[in-house]
Amino acid sequence: MYMLFENEDRSFIANLPIFFHDPAHQFLAIVLTLLGLLLGFSAAQNSLARIQLKQLALKLKNYSAWSLGENILNQAVEDEEIFKIKRVDRAILFFDIRGFTKWSEKESPENVVNMLNDYYIQAEVLTKDIPKLKVKYTADEIMVVFTNVDYAAKAAIIMRDHLNQYLEKYQLKIGGGIHLGPVVEGLIGSDKHKLFDVMGDTVNTAKRLCESAKGSEVLVSIEFIELTEGKAFTTECREVILKGKEKPFQVFPLTNYFAS
């Protein structure tokens, strides 16, 4: 463009050797070449930065989903109120592996971790289509939080049947417990370290029911039976002593469940 504006004589413009004989023209050519290289490099850097930013965003999303759970993460994007401490009604399901401690003492740490990871993966795959609020893994214990008791019961039946089949090769079994009622829910922790969790007597009772289950039983509370209105199939009611409870607690071994 500079050549066109400075020289209207086309024959002169066409004579490039003469044009570039001028030191000023040589300087301009060098500057324009360097400018083009700089712009090209800048565009490449911007493109690389965008790719790296997308990769970082994906990693952060995965890390957040691992910590919070994908369901909570998706809700938080729309409404951060989900993180606030609040009292809500939830159905809590616990499972743990019977004889896990004794079994793990005979195994290498690597074998124990590999077995647990496979166990967790199995549980996740089995319940992937069942809506749940939160899943928490603690050693051989699985806690799942549901907003709907039907989901909790359905997940319990599926997990009990299939995870016990998976654990047969280790000569292990799982037992579980379900209780429902009010919990305190939200982000719990210090300024720098927080965790989305649920707390309260409902959670403790579900855990105690799980601990009291025999073999591969899933024990449910009288509150569960009353709320589900005939959907649950159980064997005979019995009373157990739960840690922290003054009176015997009525429990029902859940055999099947039919949600409407």
Model-derived features with residue positions:
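Regulatory cytosolic signal-relay segments
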Residues: 12-88
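Short, surface-exposed loop/helix-turn segments at secondary-structure junctions
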Residues: 188-200
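Alpha-helix/helix-capping structural signal
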Residues: 98, 182-183, 204, 223
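Cytosolic regulatory/linker segments at or just downstream of nucleotide-handling modules
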Residues: 215-260
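Alpha-helical scaffold within the catalytic cores of cyclic-nucleotide enzymes
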Residues: 114-132, 143-176, 180-181, 201-214, ...
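Catalytic NTP-binding/metal-coordinating core of nucleotidyl cyclase/transferase enzymes
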Residues: 79-154
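Residues that scaffold the ATP/ADP-binding catalytic core of kinase and kinase-like folds
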Residues: 103, 145, 186-188, 227-228
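Juxtamembrane segments at transmembrane-helix boundaries
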Residues: 1-9
